[in-house]
Regions:
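Helical segment within the ABC ATPase nucleotide-binding domain
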Residues: 106-119
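ABC ATPase NBD coupling module
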Residues: 1-6, 116
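ABC-family P-loop ATPase nucleotide-binding domains
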Residues: 3, 10-90
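Walker B motif beta-strand of ABC-family P-loop ATPases
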Residues: 90-96
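Conserved H-loop
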Residues: 120-136
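H-loop (His-switch) and adjacent beta-strand-loop-beta switch element
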Residues: 136-153
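Walker B catalytic motif
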Residues: 96-97, 104
Length: 155
């Protein structure tokens, strides 16, 4: 995360006893320390959390729970997109982000990814399903088969 890389897992790990709020505060302040910045003030951090929760349609109660503990599949994926939004990485690798999501949850995740995409950020989205690509606006699509790129589409 220090260098701007974010990795989302197909099966996000649960971290019992560590609240999302504490987890994100530690991650953001570690990144800020690496960049030579002061720790984020509590009010600024809470405002950022509210903004990013709204971005991905995340219920405020999830941020008080332990990281991914007892979360549904959709909540875990939404939580990962929330983490990505909070950390604002240069490159995000999203592994099977659509796995186990219903259409509504997938739409919210796709909207979050689309809102974070700009000239200074990139995302590699790994998926086996076209449905996510219908919602995310990719610049380029590479189709891999048996470890090789067999087709490329895009500008």
């Amino acid at each position: 995360s220090h260098e701007g890389l974010f990795l989302s897992f197909q099966y996000p790990v649960e971290i019992p006893g560590v609240s999302m709020t504490n987890f994100m505060k530690a991650a953001i302040n570690a990144k800020r320390a690496y960049e030579g910045l002061e720790p984020m003030k509590a009010a600024e951090f809470m405002a950022l959390m509210r903004e990013k929760r709204q971005l991905v349609g995340m219920d405020s109660t999830l941020s008080r729970r332990s990281v991914n503990e007892g979360f549904s599949g959709g909540e875990k994926k939404r939580n990962e997109i929330f983490q990505m939004a909070m950390l604002e990485p240069k490159l995000s690798i999203l592994d099977e982000t659509d796995s186990g999501l219903d259409v509504d949850a997938m739409r919210i995740v796709a909207e979050g990814v689309n809102k974070m995409h700009n000239e200074t950020t990139s995302a590699i989205v790994i998926t086996h399903y076209e449905r996510l690509l219908e919602m995310i606006k990719p610049d380029v699509i590479h189709v891999l088969y048996k470890g090789r790129i067999v087709k490329t589409a895009g500008p």
